[in-house]
A protein has these predicted regions:
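The feature captures the beta-strand-to-loop junction immediately N-terminal to the Walker
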Residues: 34-36
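Helix-to-loop junction immediately C-terminal to a conserved catalytic motif
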Residues: 49
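Conserved ABC transporter NBD signature motif
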Residues: 57-67, 72
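Conserved ABC ATPase "signature" region
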Residues: 96, 100, 106-122
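Catalytic Walker B motif of ABC-type/P-loop ATPase nucleotide-binding domains
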Residues: 150-153
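Helix N-cap at the start of a conserved alpha-helix in ABC-type nucleotide-binding domains
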Residues: 161-163
Length: 227
């Protein structure tokens, strides 16, 4: 299992969204996408998830073009920064709606409820849940299709310390199951705790790609947090 990104580009009204960007991700990697607001991090993930289309370039998973929406649903799970759940529906109904839309067996919904310790909350409406539980539902929904690749946009945004630690454990468990994970982050401690590799975007361009040790010893890291 591997991702190949070649010349992926997105411009917004002639402004930088993502300049031509190329890199690959191999099975077993947990990649942090780092950079300031507006660097292109979310744009990159949304293109990989087929939420937005690139102006040019392409991305592939095991030779399958991610512009193919059916392939994306099967191969890629996307967890946006703000959970896009139906607040007035229950946890279980949110998952069942997604499963129905993509013809996922109902047994998979029950498995996700169990795996993510959501059974006690299955009849709760989303609006009744804490931020941490909402994020757990958000992640569970992304895993309903059993994707090979998971994309997380600022996964701990708005979570308190205990919720953040719980989410770290959950992400590590998902990674240990053999999935590729890419996540965006502003937090140095999050990158240290999770990433096996770090990619830095600046003003839409890729300026660093290396190990956590290389990153934290680099001028790129110093400049990123000095500015």
């Amino acid at each position: 299992m591997q991702i190949e990104i070649r010349g992926l580009t997105k411009l917004y009204d002639q402004k930088r969204g993502l300049l031509p960007t190329s890199f690959g991700v191999k099975h077993g990697e947990l990649v942090a996408i780092v950079g300031h607001n507006g660097a292109g991090k979310s744009t990159l993930l949304k293109m990989l998830a087929n939420w937005i289309l690139p102006d040019s370039g392409h991305a592939m998973i095991d030779g399958i073009d991610l512009r193919n929406r059916v392939a994306v649903v099967e191969k890629v799970g996307f967890v946006p920064e703000v959970p896009n759940l139906f607040d007035f529906f229950t946890v279980e109904y949110n998952l069942k709606l997604f499963a129905l839309l993509f013809r996922i067996p109902s047994t998979r919904v029950n498995n996700v409820l169990r795996e993510f310790n959501l059974l006690p909350f299955r009849k709760n409406k989303i609006q009744e849940l804490s931020k941490g539980l909402k994020q757990r539902v958000n992640i569970g929904r992304a895993l309903l299709t059993d994707p090979s690749v998971l994309l997380f946009d600022e996964p701990t945004s708005g979570l308190d310390f205990e919720m953040t630690k719980e989410l770290y454990r959950l992400l590590k468990s998902i990674h240990d199951s053999g999935k590729i994970i890419l996540f965006t982050s502003h937090r140095p401690e999050e990158i240290k705790n999770l990433a096996t590799r770090i990619i830095v975007l600046h003003e839409g361009g890729l300026v660093f790609d290396g190990s956590p040790q290389q990153y934290f010893e680099s001028e790129v890291h110093e400049n990123l947090y000095a500015s």
